[in-house]
């Protein structure tokens, strides 16, 4: 039988998808990307913000309609929306056969069996459970890079965030398990490991009594075949001297950190439930750049948080202009039910949120272009992602570029390159967020 798997949302959700795909493949199910070929449809949903929720609902309704009129025998919904609105989905969309909560995805085979048997039910587990199925993941990212989810859940409880209620408290994956998984990924040809979690920098505190990300990184660096290790979702206040030292000493660790700060005004930061002040953020960024001069820093910001004044927005703009982050994304605040911030009375109009977002991204575009121009003439190591259709050119990424969120480098060459290969490239031109180069 053939299964269509639709994975929505973040890279952490994608890891869950790949685990489920591995379990299904081990049972002999064949995967398809064509809905008309599918006997079973599985949708791994997201509901972190309003747009993600809408996308999940749209996909569920579209596949429900297809199941009603097509050949699919079962429709299963998993992921964050399934955890949050489990019974509503089952009750209001009769075409959905099974709903799997966020900590029950390891029961995907049971869900398929139940759906094919005509059952309609919700399968959940303790929200603080940590599924660790033994089946190897089916990597869907092209084979040369893969995400390694090192922890689940979050204890921070920022006032705008629903994650602790749908993903549970912070809990780390045992180190030996992660090393085994990383070795398996390397054996499959993966060359870049991208460490993800709701918060990577707190890794190990719950298991080992201390933050153990530096130790994990040193162990991962020993794995043959792995060339790059990249760290995403680092909370600024959890950055330690030991982590910085490991990044300086281990050549496999990309000099790149994803450091979400969300805002730069102290009043708003406190209302958000963040643990850092504006000055502390400045100090952290300056320290990282002093200790690792070629580090690439990515951050994210929320615009239009309840109560944000024009003056506070301008303070954020000045902060960005001063610190000049290498990579930056800005998102409009989305009120999520069951979060404290959604009950704040001083909500901001959508138009104001969007205008402030546009202000930030216009400024960041200028910063990004200046930084791209600074790269001209430099020699960089590039991981090849693929060939540009109908052209003698390839696309790749430098250590400064995480997949799907950062830029690319376009390489003009007649030489045949293979996805996953590394090549030395001289940067010859700059675009807004991308680079142009030639093979050396």
Q: Which residues does each PLM region occupy?
A:
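Terminal RNA-binding accessory module
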Residues: 343-440
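Short, hinge-like loop/turn segments at secondary-structure boundaries
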Residues: 93-94, 115-118, 211-213, 247-248, ...
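Short acidic/polar active-site loop segments enriched in Thr and Asp
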Residues: 97, 191, 227, 326, ...
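Short glycine-enriched, charge-decorated loop/helix-capping segments at active-site entrances
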Residues: 47-48, 167, 207-210, 270-276, ...
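Conserved, mostly hydrophobic/aromatic
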Residues: 178, 195, 231, 259, ...
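Conserved N-terminal phosphate-binding loop of PLP-dependent enzymes in the Aspartate aminotransferase
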Residues: 225, 325, 340-344, 352
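Proteins enriched for Cys/Gly/acidic motifs involved in redox and nucleic-acid/cofactor modification
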Residues: 1-203, 242, 253, 257, ...
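Conserved SAM/AdoMet-binding glycine-rich loop
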Residues: 75-77, 84, 187-313, 321
């Amino acid at each position: 039988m053939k299964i269509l798997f639709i994975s929505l949302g973040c890279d952490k959700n994608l890891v869950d998808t790949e685990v489920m795909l591995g379990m299904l493949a081990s049972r002999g199910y064949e995967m398809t990307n064509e809905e008309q070929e599918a006997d079973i449809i599985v949708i791994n949903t997201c509901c972190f913000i309003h747009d993600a929720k809408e996308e999940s609902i749209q996909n569920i309704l579209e596949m429900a309609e297809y199941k009603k009129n097509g050949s699919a025998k079962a429709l299963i919904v998993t992921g964050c929306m399934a955890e949050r609105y489990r019974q509503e989905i089952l009750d209001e969309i009769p075409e959905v056969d099974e709903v799997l909560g966020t900590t029950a995805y390891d029961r995907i085979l049971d869900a398929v069996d139940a759906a094919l048997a005509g059952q309609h039910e919700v399968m959940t587990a303790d929200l603080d459970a940590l599924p660790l199925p033994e089946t190897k993941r089916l990597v869907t990212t092209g084979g040369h890079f893969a995400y390694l989810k090192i922890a689940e859940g979050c204890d921070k409880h920022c006032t705008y965030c629903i994650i602790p209620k749908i993903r549970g408290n912070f809990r780390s994956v045992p180190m030996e398990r992660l090393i085994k998984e990383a070795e398996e990924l390397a054996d499959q040809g993966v060359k870049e490991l991208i460490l993800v979690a709701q918060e990577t920098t707190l890794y190990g505190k719950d298991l080992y009594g201390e933050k153990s990300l530096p130790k994990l990184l040193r162990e991962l660096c020993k794995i043959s075949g792995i060339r790059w290790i990249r760290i995403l979702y680092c909370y600024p206040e959890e950055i330690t001297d030991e982590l910085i030292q490991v990044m300086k000493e281990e050549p496999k660790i990309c000099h790149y950190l994803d450091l979400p700060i969300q805002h730069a005004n102290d009043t708003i930061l406190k209302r958000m439930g963040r643990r850092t002040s504006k000055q502390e953020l400045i100090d952290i960024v300056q320290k990282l750049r002093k200790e690792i001069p070629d580090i690439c820093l990515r951050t994210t910001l929320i615009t239009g948080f309840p109560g944000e004044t024009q003056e506070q927005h301008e303070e954020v703009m000045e902060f960005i202009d001063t610190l000049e982050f290498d990579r930056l994304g800005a998102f409009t605040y989305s009120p999520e039910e069951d979060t404290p911030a959604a009950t704040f009375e001083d909500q901001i109009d959508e138009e104001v949120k969007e205008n402030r977002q546009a202000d930030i991204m216009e400024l960041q575009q200028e910063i990004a272009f200046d930084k791209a121009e600074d790269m001209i003439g430099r020699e960089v190591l590039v991981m090849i992602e693929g060939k540009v259709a109908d052209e003698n050119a390839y696309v790749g990424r430098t250590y400064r570029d995480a997949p799907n969120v950062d830029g690319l480098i376009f390489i003009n060459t007649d030489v045949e390159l293979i996805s996953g290969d590394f090549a030395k490239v001289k940067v010859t031109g700059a675009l807004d967020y991308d680079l142009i180069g030639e093979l050396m």
